Amino acid sequence: MAEFPASLLILNGKSTDNLPLREAIMLLREEGMTIHVRVTWEKGDAARYVEEARKLGVATVIAGGGDGTINEVSTALIQCEGDGIPALGILPLGTANDFATSVGIPEALDKALKLAIAGNAIAIDMAQVNKQTCFINMATGGFGTRITTETPEKLKAALGGVSYIIHGLMRMDTLQPDRCEIRGENFHWQGDALVIGIGNGRQAGGGQQLCPNALINDGLLQLRIFTGDEILPALVSTLKSDEDNPNIIEGASSWFDIQAPHEITFNLDGEPLSGQNFHIEILPAALRCRLPPDCLLLR
């Protein structure tokens, strides 16, 4: 194998007992690759490890975990200043792995690891909420957010993405739509939202294609709203094609403002953020990410 610059893997603490991963890393090290490994224990570790990675002079920081780990590492990378900022590599090890799946990261650990180290680094967008919190994949609100936030960890560990659907069916009788107003470039809507998806990426909640037209390097956010006064009829209506579905509202903009008369919660790559006012904007070409050549989310 050709010689490649060093990488630093930031591994979610839940994945430390992954024997196939350990074997894949050892094999690549035997082939001559320099791979540093750091394990997260608490929030803030990823940012510290990214700073360490810069001091080590590595070419890539690999996020080993789910969407939340990718979010933490990518957020730390875009906050770096100066030259020589490492690219982002992705090693999907989470429950749903929505971002990794949608951009075409291989499921096989050895192939994903090689891509993370040797893949082509492409400039991609990120999004920022209220000038503070960032997301690389999607912000979701409404029914879907409450389900992903409330689904028990043991259920997620046992069933993966299917756990969200099961928990949602169990909670259906207690959930109500969120009333809100959303504005963007040439866009304005007000009403009851069952689900809100604002995507840099395309899917969330364990494989649900909420924003099927989203691209990660077009400088735009894709918006999709599933409307409805009652949960079950609205869910049934989503089985129709988009063209015939009056319960689906779509838009595209470099920013969206959301206001609600009551507190609502958005899920940002797995992390909840509650409030009544949200300003969400795209950050064009915010970082470089190592992606497969056939990635469907590139223009």
Swiss-Prot record:
It comes from the Bacteria. It comes from Shigella sonnei (strain Ss046). Probably phosphorylates lipids; the in vivo substrate is unknown. Its main location: cytoplasm. ATP binds at T40, G66, D67, G68, T69, I70, N71, E72, T95. GO terms for biological process: phospholipid biosynthetic process. Its cofactor is Mg(2+); Ca(2+). This is Probable lipid kinase YegS. The keyword Glycoprotein does not apply. Mg(2+) binds at L215, D218, L220. The active site is at E271. HAMAP family: YegS. It is found in: Cytoplasm. GO terms for molecular function: ATP binding; lipid kinase activity; magnesium ion binding. Pfam families: DAGK_cat, YegS_C. Binds 1 Mg(2+) ion per subunit. Ca(2+) may be able to substitute. InterPro entries: ATP-NAD_kinase_N, Diacylglycerol/lipid_kinase, Diacylglycerol_kinase_cat_dom, Lip_kinase_YegS, Lipid_Phosphate_FormReg, NAD/diacylglycerol_kinase_sf, YegS/DAGK_C.
